[in-house]
């Protein structure tokens, strides 16, 4: 995948996550603020917990920084897979954001 293709894919992913965070705020009464700056999306929850999702174009990876640690994801043409064999990106973000929000939320990509 070219860098341009990768960045277009990342843009779609970050837009989707940001939109879903807005839906959680409206539909589930989750206190969350989503802020986007280029290829970095920061989610800030009521208790101050931050989750940062950012693109690493040179490595063609998405990185997630959360209280529980740092995670790297690579796209295989269908899924964003953890480079260390952990859960795929939507499952990991669902768990991380559910813990931060205090209610179950689901990330779909």
Swiss-Prot record:
GO terms for cellular component: cytoplasm. InterPro entries: CyaY, Frataxin/CyaY, Frataxin/CyaY_sf, Frataxin_CS. One of its GO terms (biological process) is iron-sulfur cluster assembly. GO terms for molecular function: ferric iron binding. Coiled coil: none annotated. SUPFAM superfamilies: Frataxin/Nqo15-like. Keywords: Iron, Metal-binding. It holds the Pfam family Frataxin_Cyay. It comes from the Bacteria. Disulfide bonds: none annotated. Belongs to the frataxin family. HAMAP family: CyaY. Involved in iron-sulfur (Fe-S) cluster assembly. May act as a regulator of Fe-S biogenesis. This is Iron-sulfur cluster assembly protein CyaY. It comes from Bordetella parapertussis (strain 12822 / ATCC BAA-587 / NCTC 13253). The gene is cyaY.
């Amino acid at each position: 995948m070219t860098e341009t293709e990768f960045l277009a894919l990342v843009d779609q992913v970050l837009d989707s996550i940001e939109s879903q965070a807005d839906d959680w705020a409206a539909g589930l009464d989750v206190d969350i603020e989503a802020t986007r700056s280029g290829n970095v999306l920061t989610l800030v929850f009521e208790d101050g917990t931050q989750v940062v999702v950012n693109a690493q174009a040179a490595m063609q990876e998405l990185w997630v920084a959360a209280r529980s640690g740092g995670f790297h994801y690579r796209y295989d043409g269908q899924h964003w897979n953890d480079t260390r064999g952990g859960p795929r990106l939507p499952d990991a973000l669902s768990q991380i954001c559910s813990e931060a929000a205090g209610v179950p939320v689901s990330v779909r990509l």
